[in-house]
């Protein structure tokens, strides 16, 4: 099989902690409680991935592994690789490409620093399958589905900057409950690439309007995880096609308090929306929105 040659992708720049130390204080499989934020935060990625792989952790990954980059996953037939890489290059806000796997090898990453001792086909709590642009089924792993002609892509996630918001006492509303944040399909067009076209997906977090500029500044440093917001306020919601902030397309609705406005960030679920709009005939796989891949990469502001 041959593919059209394009310039090598420039992956988002991150640092890496190469030998994470395992944390042994996590709840066992028969415990029903959600680990506290502090328990989730201090767990290292290598240990969290082991818990997920063994089905000991099946919740949303929000709040897990503070300081490390969380990633969205998209797995495609390799014949679409160049088109997808170019889509990310042309649309870096919703699709900040961190790296990819070797074709047919979900345990081998480019760059290698993305993760050690990991299989991206087993180390995410849940996966989604799409066929002809439609959701087909949810899976616990995709080892059998990941054949020798499939390649995976990892895209930065806004969960990665939530610890920075918490440090400034801007605690995301969904974080204490461990739910995925609300996410919305918008009318913001993407720059097309080959077979791929579509619109942005955004994640939303409510905050007091008076804190908007501070929140923009905090998240602007995380360009490899969508950076600062793309829209905010009730008028901003209407402009991007979000009619009801209480009815997300993905994730869980959150409560608004008096004086709060919706703030929207680019979201790595965008590639799933692209797959649905592009209606690829072959099976395509992704993470379940809100259930991310925990990398060994860390952001250095």
Curated annotation (Swiss-Prot):
Gene Ontology MF annotations: D-glutamate cyclase activity
Enzyme Commission designation:
4.2.1.-
- Which keywords belong to this entry? Lyase
Gene3D superfamilies per UniProt: PSTPO5379-like, PSTPO5379-like domain
Superkingdom to which the source organism belongs: Eukaryota
User: What S-S linkages are listed for this chain?
Assistant: none
Q: A single Pfam family, by name?
A: D-Glu_cyclase
Extract the InterPro entries matched here: D-Glu_cyclase (IPR009906), Putative_hydro-lyase (IPR038021), UPF0317 (IPR016938)
The record's Gene Ontology cellular component field reads:
cytosol; mitochondrion; nucleus
Does the record's keyword annotation contain Secreted? no
Extract one GO BP annotation from the record: glutamate metabolic process
Asked if Lyase is a keyword of the record, the answer is yes
Q: Which family does it belong to?
A: Belongs to the D-glutamate cyclase family.
Could you identify this protein by its name? Putative hydro-lyase C5H10.01
Protein species of origin: Schizosaccharomyces pombe (strain 972 / ATCC 24843)
């Amino acid at each position: 099989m041959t593919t059209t040659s394009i310039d090598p992708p420039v992956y988002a720049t991150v640092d890496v902690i190469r030998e994470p130390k395992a944390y042994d204080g996590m709840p066992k499989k028969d415990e029903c409680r959600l680990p506290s934020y502090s328990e989730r935060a201090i767990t290292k990625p290598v240990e969290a991935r082991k818990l997920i792989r063994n089905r000991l952790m099946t919740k949303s990954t929000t709040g897990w592994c503070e300081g490390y980059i969380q990633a969205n996953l998209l797995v495609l037939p390799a014949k679409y690789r160049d088109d997808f890489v170019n889509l990310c290059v042309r649309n870096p806000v919703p699709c900040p490409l961190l790296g990819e796997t070797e074709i047919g090898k979900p345990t081998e990453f480019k760059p290698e620093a993305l993760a050690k001792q990991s299989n991206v086909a087993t180390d995410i709590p849940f996966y989604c399958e799409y066929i002809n642009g439609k959701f087909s089924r949810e899976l616990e792993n995709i080892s059998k589905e990941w054949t020798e002609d499939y390649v995976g892509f990892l895209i930065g996630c806004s969960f990665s900057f939530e610890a920075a918001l918490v440090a400034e006492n801007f605690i995301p509303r969904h974080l204490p409950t461990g739910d995925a944040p609300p996410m919305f399909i918008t009318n913001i067009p993407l720059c097309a690439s080959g077979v791929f076209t579509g619109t942005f997906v955004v994640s939303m977090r409510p905050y007091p309007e008076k804190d908007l500029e501070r929140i923009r500044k905090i998240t602007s440093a995380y360009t490899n995880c969508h950076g600062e917001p793309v829209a905010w306020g009730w008028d901003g919601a209407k402009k991007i096609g979000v009619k009801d902030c209480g009815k997300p397309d993905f994730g869980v609705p959150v409560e608004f308090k008096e004086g709060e406005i919706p703030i929207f960030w680019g979201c790595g679920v965008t590639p799933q929306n692209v797959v649905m709009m592009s209606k690829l005939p072959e099976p395509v796989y992704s993470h379940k929105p809100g259930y991310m891949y925990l990398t060994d990469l860390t952001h250095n502001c």
